[in-house]
Amino acid sequence: MNKEALVNRLNASAKRQKADIVIKNGKIMDVYNQEWIYEDIAITDGVIVGLGEYEGENIIDAEGQMIVPGFIDGHVHIESSMVTPIEFAKAVLPHGVTTVVTDPHEIANVSGEKGIEFMLEQARHTPLNIHFMLPSSVPAASFERSGAILKAADLKPFYEEEEVLGLAEVMDYVSVQQAEKDMVQKLLDARVAGKRIDGHLAGLSTDLINIYRTAFVLNDHEVTSKEEALDRIRRGMYVMMREGSVAKNTLNVLPAVNEKNARRFFFCTDDKHVDDLLSEGSVNHQVKMAIQAGLNPFLAYQLGSLNAAECYGLDTKGAIAPGFDADLLFVSDLENVTVTMTMVKGQTVAEDSKAVYQDHASTAAPDQALLDSVKLAAPLNKQDFHMPIDSEQQINVIQIIPNQLETRLVQVPAPVAREFEPDTELDLLKIAVVERHKGLKETGLGVVKGFGFKSGAIATTISHDSHNIIAVGTNDEDIAAAVNKLQEIGGGLTIIKNGEELHSVPLPIAGLLSDQSAEQVNQSLLTLHDKLSLIGFTGGFNPFLTLSFLALPVIPDIKMTTTGLFDVKSFQHISLQ
């Protein structure tokens, strides 16, 4: 802001000149006092300059609707939507999300700095306020086969970008606990730059929470219970309640919220597919859930706006008051969170559930390196997935938990044969993680229980966080065909049965993002999910999203990597038997 702009706003606030926009006949939510205000809202240069009686060059009649602050998603990986930031904005703005804090560590794990630069450039071509946290753990663990490695020196220049708020979720807790040199430098660089540091404390003890707070880690979005939430609040953290496409923790954590500690809680989605964003929305859905669960509506809206702004130092976001950006929602039904109009900095960007602005997507095209990310040394065949076993020893199996990121380690008797073959009656399927960044010919094999497929295979290049190819299936031929299909289409999601493609969703940008519109991707995903019934899937959870987290070796208990089974609690690889 320059001097001229400030003078212009002061003149409008002092009523020496008309405001650019005045909103009349609205019921304004005061998230500070938790009460309603019945006054005009005066806006100049996209900023609220007054509440009271004002004249404006343009008048908007709210017609008695409630006006609330724009929602803030406190932690989201935009890449998990499978669309670019420009298309992501079109999906969430109609639901009232006006600000997001994003961690581009998905694309950074594939393409490093080029991936971050692409996301930053895309963000500049949308009215959605997109703030960035720099990926702290690329790869998530030192033994991972990611497409890039980001050291402290690689991240430091990005702190000069105005959109960057700090260091993203620190998930390599071993490096923090052991004060590993480069991790300490990352933490220091963020602190010296006056930035925030996000946490990732999945399943960690209170001793480790102490260590994280000592490292200036401010928040955690991996909380799954009231007890975990209170442990973090006691140690000065903010707690994000998460509701994504797989991890659905809001209702389990909500009982921890009370009138005394509510300002330390806010909402996030973390990972949410575009079909879910379009159908139910983002933070608006969590506000609705919280109200339905009995939370005071004023508190629910505060958790959806002000609290995240305070956590991240966004001092012009999260409330309707002079000096704040005019990020406003017109709401016709408070409890159902029915958003009829969304404004960002005084501009109407969505109305009647649709985005109403023009973007400039063509000026933010991806670098060619992002379009060539699936690099297998050669096409795979069924022999590449053979899995010898000892029939006298039990097999270590990954047991999935529907709609959760955590898994369990179970043991089952080995079959008499000397080689493992999937057993659909026992729901024991084969899982494979195939390195796809450098053509290393490295494949980890294991057994997984809980998908319930009766035939065929599925595979995807979305495989947190290193995003190698991950596949699960009932036979080696279809697993090989699924992996090869992903190389053919440049990454994405696919279903194979009897060697034939049932449906695929291409994601050519880093194997993570589509170059199509949100609506087009949504339609393709609907077709994909419809086809799952042809391989025996009976529903209840999203198998692709569940599969995509089975290679993340920082969330308990047991995961798969390109080098085999990994026990998260002992933080070491274990054998199949």
Swiss-Prot record:
Molecular function (Gene Ontology), one example: adenine deaminase activity
Q: Does the keyword Hydrolase apply?
A: yes
The regions listed as transmembrane in this protein's record are: none
Gene Ontology terms: biological process: adenine catabolic process
Question: What class does this enzyme belong to in the EC scheme?
Answer: hydrolase
Recorded superkingdom = Bacteria
Provide the reaction this enzyme catalyses: adenine + H2O + H(+) = hypoxanthine + NH4(+)
Per the record, the similarity remark reads: Belongs to the metallo-dependent hydrolases superfamily. Adenine deaminase family.
Q: Which SUPFAM superfamilies match?
A: Composite domain of metallo-dependent hydrolases, Metallo-dependent hydrolases
Record-linked Pfam families: Adenine_deam_C, Amidohydro_1
Protein's name according to its UniProt entry: Adenine deaminase
Which cofactors must be present for this protein to function? Mn(2+)
Enzyme Commission designation: 3.5.4.2
Give the record's keywords alphabetically: Hydrolase, Manganese
